[in-house]
Amino acid sequence: MQVWCTNRVRNYETSDPDALFNLSVHTSVPYFVDYANPDDQQFVRQYRALYHTEPEDFAFQGHDVIAYFVSRMMQQGSAFTDQADLYPMQLLHCNFHFKRDNEKSGWRNRATRNLVYDKEDFSIAITK
């Protein structure tokens, strides 16, 4: 049995963090920094060296937005928006996978990160 819950449960003042781990809760979140990931660790080290402080969520988001859109524009030019669904990307803080509801609608990022609270070692892992 898997227990899935909204990502808001992580921020409830009344929720017991131990319960999330004991139940091996699964949740989907739009953003998550995996500090065990070497790429995330390198970003944090470089950010600390440059700004002498810890990166906040906006630093990771800014990195990911620039990395995604600049790389797409460099490879496809302005036409990258014609086939944005063909280029999903996993980055430091978030993933990008654009979809359209129909041909006349704009693109929406439908990517999430699925997290699992591991009761064995009290870690949070990103799953595919």
Question: How would you label these PLM feature ranges?
Answer:
Residues 1-128:
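Extracytosolic ligand-binding ectodomains
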